[in-house]
A protein has these predicted regions:
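Short beta-strand-to-loop elements that line the ligand-binding cleft
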Residues: 73-81, 146, 162-169, 175, ...
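Extracytoplasmic small-molecule ligand-binding "clamshell" domains
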Residues: 24-101, 108, 146
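Ligand-binding clefts/hinges and TM-proximal coupling segments of bilobed small-molecule sensing domains
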Residues: 73, 151-164, 235-251
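Periplasmic-binding protein-like
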Residues: 34-37, 119-122, 196-231
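Extended ligand-binding regions for polar small-molecule ligands
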Residues: 57-69, 216-250
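A ligand-binding cleft/hinge motif common to bilobed small-molecule-binding domains
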Residues: 90, 100-109, 182-210
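Bilobed "Venus flytrap"/periplasmic-binding protein-like clamshell domains
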Residues: 38, 52-68, 126-159, 165-167, ...
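Acidic, polar ligand-binding/catalytic clefts
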Residues: 77-138, 149-150, 206-207
């Protein structure tokens, strides 16, 4: 009995030491998570699960080059839904998630690398819609579709607009066309791209109500040195024109 107890304690100590080393080592593997959010990140086969070379997009290409320059190894997985991968990156050391809008409420929850790209917040309506908006408050009387767990949906909810949320933002394109919602609160260019992928075109922008910057968000336990190396790599990529070159390939 005593021998078993000593062996168990020894094994626990080894795990603790190895775990601490994995968090503190500058060159430790980082586990990166992302979602289908075209044209920034997307599975090549259009599915809601993909890994490594089967993922593409503006942010994916930028992140790959950034990690290569920083000399930090990583694995990349695209999963669904957003709320799940957000929670994993928030709670698990050595994890990160992209792309995420950097908002005041999130500032102290993660360590940030970016910006990777812009994400304007817009209200889309059907081509034949008579809706006219001058400010966000004007949308209160309409049924607004949004993406569950997204910064846009969170912001609308905080302002009392009560968005109708879905697990896949592209579903809002079809709901808008079918008259199930009056407006679609989404990002630009992501929303239009998603709509085209679902065969929906001709939507019109009736309000542009915010402009956010998208980042790589890393768990708070990721070493500061690693964050600094990644940020320096991204800054140099921007100076070299690499970020603009990547953007031009998709837009």
């Amino acid at each position: 009995m005593l021998r078993r107890l000593l062996l168990a304690l020894a094994s626990a100590c080894v795990l603790l030491v190895n775990g601490a080393h994995a968090v503190e080592s500058l060159d430790a593997d980082l586990v990166l998570l992302t979602e289908n959010f075209p044209p920034y990140n997307m599975a090549k086969n259009g599915k809601n699960f993909a890994q490594d070379e089967n993922i593409e997009g503006i942010a994916v290409d930028i992140v790959r080059e950034m990690f290569k320059r920083a000399g930090i190894t990583y694995s990349l997985t695209l999963r669904f839904p957003w709320e799940r991968i957000y929670k994993i990156a928030l709670e698990k050391p050595g994890y990160g998630v992209f792309v995420m809008a950097r908002l005041p409420d999130r500032e102290k929850l993660f360590k940030w690398v970016g910006p990777i790209g812009p994400d304007d917040w817009i209200m889309l309506a059907r081509a034949d819609s008579k809706i006219s908006l001058e400010k966000l408050n004007d949308a209160r009387k309409y049924k607004i579709g949004a993406y569950k767990g997204d910064a846009i949906a969170e912001t609308l909810a905080k302002q009392g607009l009560k968005p109708v949320v879905v697990l896949r933002d592209q579903d809002n394109a079809r709901k808008l066309v079918n008259g199930q919602i009056d407006l679609w609160a989404t990002g630009d260019p992501a929303g239009r791209y998603l709509a085209r992928q679902d065969g929906v075109t001709g939507l019109k922008t009736v309000l542009r109500f915010n402009s956010a910057e998208l980042y790589l968000a890393l768990n708070r336990n990721v070493p500061d040195d690693a964050v600094a190396k990644l940020q320096a790599a991204l800054d140099q990529m921007r100076k070299d024109g690499v970020v603009d070159e990547i953007m031009a390939r998709y837009l």
